[in-house]
């Protein structure tokens, strides 16, 4: 069993105290109790853990550690984080990112480049934010992967980003036709499946 999170955007809305309280309530009252009740010991985060690319507010960082990260460590959760575009400082590389600078556990697995990860015999292709630095490796991984499932923080053409506004940048949906399931960030609340895509709610 694997828990999935994405687009948590710690520090959103200008580090709004109201949003911090709202997010904390979700983790304390819903998310972590669910992991315990269902004996889930693995978490995959599909990217955009934090909100700002350039910096993080001290209170937001403190809250992230106290409410989220310390609890993952307390429960001994095997944590995998796929870097999203909001997690990375530069636009052309994922190598300078918030997660590697927040002093989180050395046991956490952070993915800045495509990688195939095995969970109890099932291979899953992880695809972090595709940028100049990892573009060729990402395309090669997509084209040559033998996995049936891909997870990532993807920009794909043709999905509705906002009502009436369809994304015209990124990869073509057809590039993922080989996969039985592709799990990525939520785009359109009315479009749960599209050419094999399972769109994950934020």
What are these regions (language model features)?
Residues 87-178:
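Conserved catalytic scaffold of divalent metal-dependent phosphoesterases
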Residues 200-202:
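Ligand/cofactor pocket segment of small-molecule handling proteins
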Residues 6-9, 154:
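Short, small-residue-rich loop/turn micro-motifs
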Residues 8, 12-116, 179-198:
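Core catalytic region of metal-dependent phosphoesterases/phosphodiesterases
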């Amino acid at each position: 069993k694997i828990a999935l999170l994405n687009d948590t955007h710690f520090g959103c809305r200008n580090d709004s105290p109201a949003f911090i309280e709202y997010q904390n309530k979700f983790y304390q009252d819903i998310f972590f109790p669910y992991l315990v009740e269902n004996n889930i010991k693995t978490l995959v985060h599909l990217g955009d853990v934090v909100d700002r690319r350039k910096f993080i507010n001290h209170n937001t960082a403190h809250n992230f550690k106290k409410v989220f990260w310390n609890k993952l460590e307390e429960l001994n959760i095997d944590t995998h984080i796929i870097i999203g575009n909001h997690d990375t400082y530069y636009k052309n590389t994922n190598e300078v990112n918030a997660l590697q600078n927040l002093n989180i556990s050395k046991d956490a697995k952070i993915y800045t480049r495509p990688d195939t990860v095995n969970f109890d015999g099932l291979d899953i292709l992880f695809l972090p934010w595709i940028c100049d630095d990892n573009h060729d490796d990402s395309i090669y991984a997509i084209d040559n992967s033998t996995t049936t499932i891909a997870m990532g923080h993807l920009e794909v053409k043709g999905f509705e980003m906002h009502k009436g506004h369809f994304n015209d940048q990124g990869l073509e949906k057809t590039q993922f036709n080989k996969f039985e399931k592709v799990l990525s960030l939520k785009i359109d609340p009315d479009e749960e499946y599209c050419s094999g895509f399972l769109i994950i709610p934020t």
